[in-house]
Swiss-Prot record:
Pathway: Carbohydrate biosynthesis; gluconeogenesis; Carbohydrate degradation; glycolysis; D-glyceraldehyde 3-phosphate from glycerone phosphate: step 1/1. SUPFAM superfamilies: Triosephosphate isomerase (TIM). GO terms for molecular function: triose-phosphate isomerase activity. Homodimer. It catalyses: D-glyceraldehyde 3-phosphate = dihydroxyacetone phosphate. Involved in the gluconeogenesis. Catalyzes stereospecifically the conversion of dihydroxyacetone phosphate (DHAP) to D-glyceraldehyde-3-phosphate (G3P). It is an enzyme of class 5 (isomerase). Substrate binds at residues 9-11, 171, 204, 225-226. This is Triosephosphate isomerase. The active site is at residues 96, 165. The gene is tpiA. Belongs to the triosephosphate isomerase family.
């Protein structure tokens, strides 16, 4: 049986000192975590080495917030798999809506990152999602289909997590109805053609909606932004019922 993956994306938050304080409060809150789930946290690059000294638990792993498709070279501001693996990083987020928006990241680039992550021994968490305008025009399924087909070409679904993050729900307080999110996740599973692929939902996930989200048949985890910055809130999400 696949484990649920509860992932926190800290984005551009948390210094090394703040990371240490967070983990010292957070880890005792998840010590009795059920064995059907795993927690993954993506700290900023500067805090990864601090985090790595706390990641020797079976239920807690580190993710990178991005990854390049080469191991070294003249790629200013990028980071390579071998740099991350040195610090016990196991996962890498790729294709998040923010680099798609702010840096015009394409499905082709996302695919290169995902494929190289897998070939380097990391598990990519590939984000897909539609804008509010696309949703209102009835284009959500078409957009998701394109992102999955182009962004996940030549990837191994047995070493892959897909995060469905409707862009209009990220950091807005608006949450996609759990049943609607489940339909998109079912579509993604059908497109992948592998029943055991892990599919997360992301977008204003909070302690007061996690139980409903995780009750859905095709949702196997969550990718959490703001609520992962508070150890008490994130521990409640991790200990969903």
């Amino acid at each position: 049986m696949r484990k649920s993956v509860i992932a926190g994306n800290w984005k551009m938050h948390m210094t090394c000192a703040e990371t240490k304080n967070y983990l010292e409060e957070f880890i005792p809150l998840i010590k009795d975590l059920p064995n059907d789930r795993k927690i993954v946290i993506a700290p900023p690059f500067t805090a990864i080495s601090t985090f790595s000294s706390y990641s020797n638990f079976d239920y807690l792993d580190i993710a990178s917030q991005n990854i390049h498709w080469e191991d070294q070279g003249a790629f200013t501001a990028e980071i390579s798999p071998k740099m991350l693996i040195e610090h016990n990083v196991k996962y890498a987020i790729v294709g998040h809506s923010e680099p798609r928006k702010y840096f015009s990241e394409s499905d082709e680039q996302i695919n290169k990152r995902a494929v190289f992550a897998q070939s380097s021994g990391l598990t990519p968490i590939v984000c897909v999602g539609e804008t509010l305008e696309q949703r209102e025009r009835g284009e959500a399924n078409r957009v998701i289909t394109r992102q999955v087909e182009q962004g996940l070409e030549n990837t191994d679904p047995s070493n892959l997590i897909i995060a469905y993050e409707p862009i209009w729900a990220i950091g807005t307080g608006k949450t996609c109805e759990a049943s609607d999110a489940n339909k998109i996740c079912a579509l993604i599973r059908e497109l992948i053609g592998f029943d055991d692929v892990i599919i997360q939902y992301g977008g204003s996930v909070k302690p007061n909606n996690i139980d409903e989200i995780m009750s859905m048949s095709d949702i196997n985890g969550v990718l959490v932004g703001g609520s992962s910055l508070d150890p008490i809130s994130f521990s409640r999400i991790a200990n969903y019922e």
